[in-house]
Each structure stands twice: as C-alpha cells, then as structure tokens.
Amino acid sequence: ALDLTTADLLPEFKALADDLDPGLRLTMDGQDSYGIPYNVEGYGYIVDKEMIAALVGEDNVDSFIEKYKTATYDEFADFVEKVNAYIKDGKGNDFALSGQTFSLLAEKNEKAEKLEGVFSVAGSEKWTYGDHLINIPIDSVFPNVAAAVNATDEQLDKLYNPMVAYAKTLDLITSHAVSERGPEFINSTTNGYDAAVANFANGKTLFIKQGNWCYTNIKNANSEIVDTLTILPIKMPFEQGDIAVDGLTVEHMNSSIPVFCGNYYVLNKQVSQHELEEAQKFLVWLNTSEEGQHYVTEEMAF
C-alpha cells in the first residue's frame, strides 16, 4: 500500500489526503496514512420519531430528542423500564430526561400497540456488540487506533471499569429486547441481522442499535418510516474517573455518537504510474465533484 504522507501524489489528491481528519486516517503509528475513506459510519440508537410521538405526544417529540441527548445513563435506564412496563401493561408513567418530566400517553394509539419490546437486537451477530458497541468503552481510554494498537499493560488495566459499564449497558439492552434471552437469542436463523431490522422497521421495537449503514435495509423492509428516522446517543454508566483520555468527559460520551471509517480505498504501489494517477483522479472526482458526492450520499446511502 502507498503511504499518502510520503508518496509523490497529484496536487488535487494530496490536498484530499492531507485534509483527512486524523481520527479517520488508516494509520498504524498516527503519522502514516494509507487510505481514503470508503465511507464514514456513525451508530447509536436508531428511532422513528413517529414512534416517539406515539409514546409522549407529537408536541413533545422535539423536546424529547433535545433532552434525551444530554440525559444521564440513570435517566435513560429509568425511561427504558417505564417504556417496557408501558408495553407490557399499558400503564402510562412519568419519566425525566435532563431534568424535564415527560409522560407516556394514557391511551395507546395504533402505532404504540404494535410495540413488543424496547430494543431490537441481532443476538447472533457478534459484531453488533463485539465490534461496534465495545468501541465506546475502548474510546474512554484510547484517543485513537494507534494508541490502542500500542497499548501498555497499565492502559489495559484502565479498561476494567469502562468494560463493566459496557456490560451493564449490554444487559439493559438485551433484557428489554423483543427477543427473549436464551438459546434462541443467539440463533442466526431466527435472530440475525435481517430479523432484527424487520422487527424495528415493522414497529415492534422503539430502538435498534445500528448505524447509517442500516438505512437501505430499513428502507427495503418499510420505506414509510425512513424519512422520520434519527439516531440518538448510546448511554453508558461511566464515572468521570473511568475516562483516561485528556479532555474527554462522561457528558460528551453520552451525548454524542461514535463516528468511524470501516473501509478505505488504498492505492497499490505495485501498479504503473498511469494506473496510480487514474486512481487518484477517480477518488478526487468521487469525493469532491457534485456528481461523485451524489453517488456517495444518495445512491450508496452513506
């Protein structure tokens, strides 16, 4: 692979490569850079705003989303319990987010009646909680990939409390999922990715923990809801003492969504100079032209 920081590049491509956010670089030591992002992914709790309206009323949707973003983990956990009880017995209860009180509607409408669980979880898909969700506690100790790759024993020891917070969060999600925990929960035939997406898209759950890559799957399952979807931050019960990254706070971690790059365009340094130049021109066009950006954001749904 060609190191974009030292190679002789076309000026337009060099500008594109140099403009990459350091956190999105394909790097092993924090200095080199070997790729241009294929896409940028972000994940959290995907929710249909119309389902929020079915729970707290249409007039309260915007304030719910605003207050949710800055709510604590304890407030979120209480909200999950209240919604779970609402699904099971239909009793409306009050809950607070960022100190503001909301009330679950006394009578369920048709949309709320369809709810069977708070979360849709693809239990058989280990990447959803083993590759993605677990990155949140890792981010509390390591500022970037290079730091994690070169971790010391002392840094690894600092992961203990963040991992406990992760386990509590995972327990909250799976214990309030539409699929019951047990052997069937990790059965790929009955509780895989497609089944989880279908449960959410068809209104059986309030949340699904996924990212923007899920858009096309949700659209294929139920195109009527894609225009009213949003992504909310994942909450974890961190203490400030658990955070080892300078300048990072519990409030920031619980009010923002993780953004990362999982795939890259990499230039093969073994090919001809002509092929290298054509590849650079293509990537410049794809990432800077109006037509190229249209394909990335609209056709590829990134």
Question: Where are each of the predicted segments found?
Answer:
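Extracytoplasmic/periplasmic solute-binding protein
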Residues: 25-39, 43-45, 74-151
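Hinge/lid segment of periplasmic solute-binding proteins
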Residues: 1-44, 100-114, 232, 240-250
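Short helices/loops that flank or line small-molecule/ion binding pockets
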Residues: 1, 52, 75-87, 108-110, ...
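Extracytoplasmic "Venus flytrap"/periplasmic binding protein-like
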Residues: 1-19, 50-55, 59-62, 206-207, ...
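Glycine-rich, aromatic-lined ligand/substrate-binding cores of catalytic
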Residues: 170-175, 195-218
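A local structural motif
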Residues: 60-67, 171-191, 204, 224-228
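Extracytoplasmic/periplasmic substrate-recognition and gating elements
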Residues: 31, 222-301
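Glycine-centered hinge/linker elements that transmit conformational signals in sensory
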Residues: 77-80, 144-190
